């Protein structure tokens, strides 16, 4: 068979882009060689509908062992009693939890997308906002932070069946214990979506949802530094609160309800090559080396935020507790879209992002989101954050000057071009 030169040339082009640029998208990271090797292995050939020991296909003896290792490592990493490693993505994990816990039309309470939430937390363009009745909490105009008393007021008024504690562009830690008190006060299931800070949470660097939330979902990339995929967990299994029973008349455990919601409820065959890569990534995350990495991600983010503030950039909430920051650019007279496009020309990748109380459309936005997981994987430290922010500032202040953009691109290439992708 002829090699598909067109595609493989483009793969090399993308590899060169990643090597020579500064990757600051908060949801992106670089995986290790062994994670990539597992993801590209012969396991992609195997169909394995069902769960370990209970498959609908023969020949699953090996993938059963691999999937069970992934499950056990996920439980060890987060201190969970239950883990399902089959969701193809974080969105699929959330879809499965919603289907397990809700009926169409039920009320949910999530973080407003325009304030830092995620599409799957009730956005009207997403399944979560179409199948269910979404209500929202957001940040305070003065502080850019959550006000838990107001969240309680909203929950009391709206009486949601499910509350989602999680975000995609919120730079502060979340009080999961307070969220649980709010959920209990209205009889709601509490789901934490920790897709962004999962790696930091796993190593004890941020508040732990496991003791407080009924169900936890996450992606397996981002700060966990694994393949693109999803994960569902529970700190403790419990009897489903809706009285669903087995054919023998016993109350189904929530673990069984969730498993059934993933397969056959929302997915068919699991991606066993990706599950193997998840297992490898979980194994890496269990090490002391990963703890040092996660700490450095956090240190780099704090150093970067301080450097932005020093240059009169408005960071929503004034700083960061995790791996990211959301920057309101309105005082710099540039839109998020313009900033993103100019930075790409300078070999710096960020994403435009709405900011709370934004007056621009989601396609233009007033802000950018910036994160440190990927550049930390490449070995950059606190002292490098000042240099990076200086690059960004130079681009933003001269975003229409092609000569300066090229000058910054050359400086970025000099900084990153000889540096390995996976260092830390």
Swiss-Prot record:
PROSITE patterns listed in its UniProt record: SHMT (PS00096)
**Broad enzyme group:** transferase
Under PANTHER family, the record lists: SERINE HYDROXYMETHYLTRANSFERASE, SERINE HYDROXYMETHYLTRANSFERASE 1
Q: What is its main location?
A: cytoplasm
Keywords assigned by UniProt?
Amino-acid biosynthesis, Cytoplasm, One-carbon metabolism, Pyridoxal phosphate, Transferase
Per its UniProt record, what InterPro entries does this chain match?
Answer: PyrdxlP-dep_Trfase (IPR015424), PyrdxlP-dep_Trfase_major (IPR015421), PyrdxlP-dep_Trfase_small (IPR015422), Ser_HO-MeTrfase (IPR001085), Ser_HO-MeTrfase-like (IPR049943), Ser_HO-MeTrfase_PLP_BS (IPR019798), SHMT-like_dom (IPR039429)
Positions modified as N6-(pyridoxal phosphate)lysine?
Answer: 222
* Subunit relationships: Homodimer.
Q: What is its EC number?
A: 2.1.2.1
Its pathway, per UniProt, is: One-carbon metabolism; tetrahydrofolate interconversion; Amino-acid biosynthesis; glycine biosynthesis; glycine from L-serine: step 1/1
Cytoplasm found in the keyword field: yes
- One matching Pfam family: SHMT
Note the site residues: Plays an important role in substrate specificity. 221
Superkingdom of origin organism: Bacteria
Q: Which SUPFAM superfamilies match?
A: PLP-dependent transferases
Record-annotated residues binding (6S)-5,6,7,8-tetrahydrofolate? 113, 117-119, 361-363
Give Gene Ontology CC terms: cytosol
Q: Where does the record say this protein resides?
A: Cytoplasm
- The gene it comes from is glyA
Designated name of the protein: Serine hydroxymethyltransferase
Q: Which reaction does it catalyse?
A: (6R)-5,10-methylene-5,6,7,8-tetrahydrofolate + glycine + H2O = (6S)-5,6,7,8-tetrahydrofolate + L-serine
Source species of the chain: Flavobacterium psychrophilum (strain ATCC 49511 / DSM 21280 / CIP 103535 / JIP02/86)
Q: Name one GO molecular function term.
A: pyridoxal phosphate binding
């Amino acid at each position: 068979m002829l090699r598909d030169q067109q595609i493989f040339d483009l793969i090399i082009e993308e590899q060169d882009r990643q090597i020579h640029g500064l990757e600051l998208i908060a949801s992106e990271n670089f995986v290790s060689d062994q994670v990539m090797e597992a993801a590209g292995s012969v396991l992609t050939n195997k169909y394995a509908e069902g769960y370990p020991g209970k498959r609908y296909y023969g020949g699953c003896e090996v993938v059963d062992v691999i999937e069970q290792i992934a499950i056990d490592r996920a439980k060890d990493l987060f201190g969970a009693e239950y883990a399902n490693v089959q969701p193809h993505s974080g969105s699929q994990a959330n879809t499965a939890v919603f289907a397990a816990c809700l009926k169409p039309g039920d009320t949910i309470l999530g973080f407003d997308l325009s304030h830092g939430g995620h599409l799957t937390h009730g956005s009207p363009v997403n399944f979560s906002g179409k199948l269910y009745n979404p209500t929202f909490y957001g940040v305070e105009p003065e502080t850019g932070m959550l006000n838990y008393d107001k969240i309680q007021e909203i929950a009391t008024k709206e009486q949601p069946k499910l509350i989602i504690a999680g975000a995609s562009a919120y730079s502060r830690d979340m009080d999961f214990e307070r969220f649980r008190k709010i959920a209990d006060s209205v009889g709601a299931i509490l789901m934490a979506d920790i897709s962004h800070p999962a790696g930091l949470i796993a190593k004890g660097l941020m508040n732990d949802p496991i003791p407080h939330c009924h169900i936890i979902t996450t992606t397996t990339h981002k700060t966990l530094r694994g393949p693109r995929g999803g994960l569902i967990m529970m700190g403790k299994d419990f009897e489903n609160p809706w009285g669903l029973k087995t054919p023998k008349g016993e109350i189904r455990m929530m673990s069984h309800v969730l498993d059934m919601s993933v397969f056959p409820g929302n997915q068919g065959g699991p991606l066993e090559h990706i599950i193997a890569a998840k297992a490898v990534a979980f194994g890496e995350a269990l090490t002391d080396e990963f703890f040092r990495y996660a700490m450095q991600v956090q240190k780099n983010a704090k150093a970067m935020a301080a450097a932005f503030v020093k240059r009169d950039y408005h960071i929503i909430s004034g700083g960061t507790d995790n791996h990211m920051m959301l920057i309101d650019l309105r005082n710099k007279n540039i839109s998020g879209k313009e900033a993103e496009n100019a930075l790409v020309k300078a070999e710096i990748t960020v994403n435009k992002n709405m900011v709370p109380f934004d007056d621009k459309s989601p396609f233009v936005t007033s802000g950018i989101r910036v994160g440190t997981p990927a550049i930390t994987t490449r070995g950059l430290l606190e002292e490098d954050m000042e240099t990076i922010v200086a690059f960004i500032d130079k681009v933003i202040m001269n975003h229409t000057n092609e000569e300066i953009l090229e000058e910054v691109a050359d400086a970025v290439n000099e900084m990153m071009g000889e540096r390995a992708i996976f260092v830390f």
